[in-house]
Amino acid sequence: PWQSKEEQEMSEEIHSTLRFSNVSTSKKSGELAQKLKKDGAFASLLRARQSCIMPSLLKHKIGKNSKYSGVVKCSSKLDYVTNFILERKNNGKGKLVFCHFREEINQVVARLKAGGIEKVGIMDGRVTADMRKKVLTTKYDVLVLQIQTCCEGINLQDNYSEIYFISPHWNPSIEDQAIGRCHRIGQKKDVEVFRFVMSGQEFETDTEDDEAVTLETYINNRQNEKREIGKVLLDN
């Protein structure tokens, strides 16, 4: 759930630029929505994702004089996700946390360390080949990864058995490959997977019959459809 009304309203205005969201057309007149219309559909998709994860990812688009300028200090999702991980920090299971953005990775790492988890590693596009080898051979309590660069080609089954997706990926096979990093031969523990999706239930719609959805909910629904299609094709 959204912990800040301003954070919810900002995401709601951004989502109003996406037809599938069913957000009330009255939100399209906002200053931020107007900016996004000029930037095009792909920009709206990116900003909608960022608004669900961490508003500070939008700080350059929001501007200092915007009514949403204070929202950059909020992140309902990261508050929930990191608290959830911290509640499980003493269960003896290594954790893989998959993110999309570098700033998101930095924030997750900082929050986990502040919560008392000392051994937190990072693997993203900034990691060199030599550093990568060290990361892969070090046993961290939590390893935070950028999903697009670390979903394949690495074996992590020896140290990790919990997987967290902070935001869904458009391609379900990317997530399946990410899970495969530790759900493979040699894994001695049950692997648990946690996915986090922001809801649009609190967003305003034009009619009572409409149901507003966030980009994350939309992607999650498309993932399920793709998996069902794949299952039918394989069964036949």
For each feature predicted by the language model, list its residue ranges.
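SF2 helicase motor core recognition
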Residues: I105-V109, M131-K133, L143-D190
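A conserved SF2-helicase RecA2
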Residues: W170-N236
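Residues at the starts of beta-strands that form the adenosine-phosphate
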Residues: G94, K119, E162, D190-E192
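RecA-like P-loop NTPase motor core
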Residues: P1-R19
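Cytochrome P450 catalytic domain signature, combining two hallmark sequence patches
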Residues: T17-S29
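Conserved Helicase C-terminal RecA-like lobe
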Residues: P1-E7, K27-N155, D235-N236
